[in-house]
Structure formats: C-alpha cells, structure tokens
C-alpha cells in the first residue's frame, strides 16, 4: 500500500468537489476558482476555453499544475506544439515535492512519442532519470518515473494503491494512462485508456484522465 500521501492539486472544497463528484460540469463551469472552472470545461469538451482559463489564472506561470493542465487542454484542442511548450514551462514551475516534479517530464516524454519528436522524448526520459530514486515510488505520482524507465513493473504500478477512494481514483486513472502509453500492443493500450477514462469523480483532477479520453477519441495509438 502506498504511503498515505499524495501530491494534491487542490485541497477539496466542499461545493465544487461535490459538483465534480456528481458530474455536474455545467454548474462547475461557473465556479470562480479557475482550476474547477477549467476542469469543467475540459470535461465539457471546450478545450480552447479550458486552456485560456488555466493560462490566464493568477500565478499560472509559476504553477506546475496549471501549466500541465493548460498543456493538456491545448493538446486536446489539436495544438500539440503549444501543448509541449506548456509542459516544458511546467518543468521549471512550482511542484509539491519531488514526486510532483515527475509529471511534467513524463508529459514531455508522452509528447515526444505522439508528435513524434525525439527531442522531447529524450529530454523527458533524461529528466525522469535524474529524478528517479526507489523511495520516490512511495508517493504518487513518483512511481510514474520508475515505470516509464522500466524500474517498476506494471502489476505493482497498477495495483499498489490507496485506501482513500478519491486518492485511488486519481492514482488509478493516471496509472492506466501511463500503462497505455507504454504498451506496445494497440488493443491492450486502448483497454488501459478506456480504464483511465472510465473512472469518474476525483479522477477529473488528473491530466492523464483527460488525455486518455483524447486517446480514445483520436485513436492515437502506436
């Protein structure tokens, strides 16, 4: 069982969190906080609008989370190079501890695979290599680095989770996305993306949940 820690995007706020859990995205899109509003717009398929919300939020350029989400929104809007630029910017932005710093280089590696662009792929892999230490596997999303580098096996990567249902929804959605990215067999990859996209509720807080839906819409499989 993973240590009861998690790199939190935002401590749950009762009303928006309840709207998110209930899938009431039209209402959530009217929330004042840009994180909740942007997530709702992502769920509603209004990707360009979501990107603008994340990018224009106060302090967005210093927030790894906002830049990662902005990149996902740009990616889903078909602006892949702009998305990669947002993820590159996220490399130097603020993160919650060493585990939180894993996501931006992982997303850059993903961009390198899908665009494809070997520069992004190699840079993402190199940065993950610098970050990876076995103890990082105790706090999500730390295990993502080890998994993408071949240091963590798929079964424990998918199965070693949290008791808290919200944390586990977020972790499992992310884990299935990265398993799909790494999987060589297109049908198995698609199954992982389906698992990631199907998890509801708190999973919407995770970039990977939205990118998995994009994979299914676009059939962007190797």
Where are these regions (language model features)?
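Alpha-helical adaptor scaffolds
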Residues: 35-43, 129-168
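Structural motif corresponding to the intra-repeat A-B loop/turn of tetratricopeptide repeats
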Residues: 22, 44, 77, 115-118, ...
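Structural signature of alpha-solenoid helical repeat junctions
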Residues: 36, 62, 100-102, 107, ...
């Amino acid at each position: 069982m993973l240590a009861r820690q998690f790199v939190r995007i935002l401590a749950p706020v009762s009303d928006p969190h309840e709207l998110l859990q209930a899938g009431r995205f039209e209402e959530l899109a009217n929330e004042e906080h840009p994180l909740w509003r942007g997530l709702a717009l992502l769920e509603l398929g209004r990707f360009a609008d979501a990107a603008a919300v994340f990018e224009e939020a106060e302090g967005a350029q210093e927030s790894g989370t906002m830049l990662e989400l902005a990149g996902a929104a740009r990616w889903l809007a078909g602006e892949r190079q702009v998305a990669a630029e947002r993820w590159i910017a996220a490399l130097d932005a603020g993160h919650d501890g060493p585990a939180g710093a894993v996501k931006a280089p992982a997303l850059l590696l993903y961009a390198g695979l899908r665009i494809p662009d070997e520069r992004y792929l190699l840079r993402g892999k190199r940065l993950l290599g610098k970050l990876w230490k076995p103890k990082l596997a105790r706090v999500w999303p730390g295990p993502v680095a080890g998994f993408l580098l071949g240091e963590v096996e798929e079964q424990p990567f998918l199965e070693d989770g949290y008791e808290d249902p919200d944390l586990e929804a977020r972790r499992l959605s992310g884990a299935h996305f990265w398993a799909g990215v790494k999987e060589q067999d297109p049908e198995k990859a698609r199954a992982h993306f389906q698992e990631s996209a199907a998890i509801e509720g708190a999973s919407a807080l995770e970039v990977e949940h939205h990118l998995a839906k994009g994979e299914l819409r676009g059939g962007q499989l190797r």
